[in-house]
C-alpha cells in the first residue's frame, strides 16, 4: 500500500471481509505515520485483478484460501509475500500454479501505537521471479513496470527458489 498508493492509473485495494473490512473502511491502515484508505473489496468484487499480493500471518492462510480462489481470474498474477517457503504451494491447491509469481519480501518493520513503521531506505524489498525460463517473462516485466518509481525496492531473479530458501 505504501509504495503503490501514489501510482497513477491503477486501482489499489485490499481484499477483506467481516470486521477487518469494516475496520479498514472506517480507519484505513497506517504505515510510517501516514493513514492510507485503499478500496476495500470482497473477494468477488476483486475478481480478476491484475495483481493480488497475499500478505497475511502464516496461520491465517488456510482460512483465506477460498477468498484467494474467488479473487483470482485467468490472468491474475499472485505474489505471496509471506514468511515460510510453502505458501505458494498452499495457494496452488485452490488456483492454477501458472498464476503464481514466486516472491518474498525482506523488510524490518515494527508496530507502533498508530500502525506499522519501516525504513524504506534500508529495506531490501521484494524479490520475485519465474521458476522456469523464460525468466524475463512478460509477467516479470509488468511487475517491474508497476513497481518502478514507487520507492519500493525490488528486483527479479532467475533463482527465486534459492532466494526463498535462503531467506
What does each of the following model-derived ranges do?
Residues 50, 166-167:
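A short, glycine/Asx- and small/polar-enriched loop/turn
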Residues 41, 70-71, 94-99, 114-166:
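Internal alpha-helical scaffold of NAD(P)-dependent oxidoreductase catalytic cores
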Residues 33-117:
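Rossmann-like NAD(P)(H) cofactor-binding subdomain of soluble oxidoreductases
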